[in-house]
């Protein structure tokens, strides 16, 4: 990669793009630019137990409830806007053109 004695300047050429190994061991890890873990865990650390993992079911249920609420809120706003438009046009004279 880069030696400590190398000075990089704008316009310097690149010999090749840095590559890192990819495996299941890197999933969910925090790594630096040199693909070295910086989260304090070993590369082959065991996965957390099922009990200690956060439940995603509650998050999905909350997200669905929020979506349903927002859809209902949008519908109510549309009804308010359309009724306001009708109310604002109630005093106007309508001319039909044939």
UniProtKB/Swiss-Prot annotation:
Question: Which keywords, in A-to-Z order, does the entry hold?
Answer: ATP synthesis, ATP-binding, CF(1), Chloroplast, Hydrogen ion transport, Ion transport, Membrane, Nucleotide-binding, Plastid, Thylakoid, Translocase, Transport
Q: What is its main location?
A: plastid
List where in the cell it is found. Plastid, Chloroplast thylakoid membrane
Q: In its UniProt entry, what is this protein called?
A: ATP synthase subunit alpha, chloroplastic
Q: How does it sit in the membrane?
A: Peripheral membrane protein
Protein function:
Produces ATP from ADP in the presence of a proton gradient across the membrane. The alpha chain is a regulatory subunit.
UniProt record, GO biological process: ATP biosynthetic process; proton transmembrane transport
- Is Hydrolase one of the keywords? no
Family under the similarity heading: Belongs to the ATPase alpha/beta chains family.
**Subunit text:** F-type ATPases have 2 components, CF(1) - the catalytic core - and CF(0) - the membrane proton channel. CF(1) has five subunits: alpha(3), beta(3), gamma(1), delta(1), epsilon(1). CF(0) has four main subunits: a, b, b' and c.
What one GO molecular function would you report for this record? Answer: ATP binding
Reactions listed under catalytic activity: ATP + H2O + 4 H(+)(in) = ADP + phosphate + 5 H(+)(out)
Could you give one GO CC term from the UniProt record? proton-transporting ATP synthase complex
Q: What is its EC number?
A: 7.1.2.2
């Amino acid at each position: 990669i880069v030696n400590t004695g190398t000075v990089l300047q704008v316009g310097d050429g690149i010999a090749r793009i840095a590559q890192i190994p990819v495996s299941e061991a890197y999933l969910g890890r925090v790594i630096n630019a040199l693909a070295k873990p910086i989260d304090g865990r070993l590369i082959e650390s065991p996965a957390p137990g099922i009990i200690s993992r956060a439940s995603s079911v509650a998050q999905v249920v909350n997200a669905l409830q929020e979506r349903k609420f927002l859809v209902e809120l949008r519908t109510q706003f549309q009804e308010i806007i359309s009724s306001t438009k009708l109310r604002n046009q109630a005093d106007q004279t309508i001319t039909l053109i044939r």
